[in-house]
Amino acid sequence: MEEGERWIVVPTWRVPGRMEKWHSLVKYLKHRTKDLEGVCYVPHHKVGWAWWTCSRVIFPLQGNSHLEIQAYWNLTPEKGWLSSYAVRITWYTERFWTDVTPDCADSLIHSTYFSCFTAGEVRRAIRGEKLLSCCNYPQAHRSKVPLLQFLALVVVQQNGRPQKNSTTRKRWRSNYWRGFRLARKDGRGHKQRGSEPPASGAYFPGVAKVLEILA
């Protein structure tokens, strides 16, 4: 009995243009600014047998996991060579792997790379003071990365509560509820609080924006 063709179906995200913008940004952040120094960029001529793969960008993450953004080309050969592009975004851990959305990829990348709020900003948030820096990866905060006010509350909880019947305890209680109200207010709009000078490091606009991904 003759065996028929077998197809492997994977979820991909369409890319309207060519991949040069994505490749150039990755190489710039890897070799020039060093923000992505630990990232592995594999061009098409080093991929090997997977001739449909344009490139692979592998982001090592925390906890022995990594994120891989694999670019495909030649998806519609009947319309011309290299006529269509798409990317597959996959998260690998020790026990499982799964395909993720661009928003989830932004959160995973931000957990390891790029400058965010410093410890000093967290202390300012606890005291209710004006923040002096902002995040270099604001796109990632739309999904799973906690707001700064939430991080500040976590720090307060980890440090423990002051003793009873003390001025410090009353001040802590006042700052706690003030921070809680700020967190609830900011959580509705997913907006960052901060002012003019950014944190040190390169700005990253997000995976979907760089690739101009079409859903």
Curated annotation (Swiss-Prot):
Counteracts the innate antiviral activity of APOBEC3G. Forms a complex with host APOBEC3G thus preventing the entry of this lethally hypermutating enzyme into progeny virions. Functions as an adapter molecule, recruiting APOBEC3G to the ubiquitin-proteasome machinery. Targets APOBEC3G for degradation through the assembly with elongin BC complex, CUL5 and RBX1. Binds viral RNA and affects the stability of viral nucleoprotein core. May play a role in viral morphology. Keywords: AIDS, Host cell membrane, Host cytoplasm, Host membrane, Host-virus interaction, Membrane, Phosphoprotein, Ubl conjugation, Ubl conjugation pathway, Virion. A motif (HCCH motif) lies at residues 110-141. The BC-like-box motif mediates the interaction with elongin BC complex. The HCCH motif (H-x(5)-C-x(18)-C-x(5)-H) mediates the interaction with CUL5. Belongs to the primate lentivirus group Vif protein family. It is a peripheral membrane protein. GO terms for biological process: viral life cycle. The modification Phosphothreonine is found at residue 98. It is found in: Host cytoplasm; Host cell membrane; Virion. This is Virion infectivity factor.
